[in-house]
């Protein structure tokens, strides 16, 4: 039986957050990088799917938080979640990526101040 990747929920959450922020922050970031063209306006076509991406972000980060902060007693002996240094590193990575996802998901509201 194959072991699941413990980082999958975090990686999936960040990818979903990128999808949620692509319609709003995407054109702004591309313009900051010097990329231009009329096709950039097509990124707003993803706006109707934004709530789905946001729900996906919440679900994946909720699952990741549950996996990262579950009690040590629930971990099998010898696995990485039972090692204190690995647990601490995963918690830091979880919060850094959650903050990144929050910035991307809320970009629809704050990007207007910079554009």
Curated annotation (Swiss-Prot):
Give the protein name, as stated in the record.
Mercuric transport protein MerT
Per UniProt, what is the membrane topology? Multi-pass membrane protein
| Family, similarity comment | Belongs to the MerT family.
Function summary: Involved in mercury resistance. Probably transfers a mercuric ion from the periplasmic Hg(2+)-binding protein MerP to the cytoplasmic mercuric reductase MerA.
Q: Which residues cross the membrane?
A: 10-30, 45-65, 92-112
Instruction: Give the molecular function GO annotations.
Output: mercury ion transmembrane transporter activity; metal ion binding
Give the InterPro entries listed for this entry. Answer: Transprt_MerT
**Keywords on record:** Cell inner membrane, Cell membrane, Membrane, Mercuric resistance, Mercury, Metal-binding, Plasmid, Transmembrane, Transmembrane helix, Transport
Task: Kindly indicate whether the keyword Cytoplasm belongs to this entry.
Answer: no
Task: Return any one Pfam family short name.
Answer: MerT
Q: What GO cellular-component annotations does this UniProt entry give?
A: plasma membrane
Q: Which residues bind Hg(2+)?
A: 23-24, 75, 81
Q: Where in the cell is it found?
A: Cell inner membrane
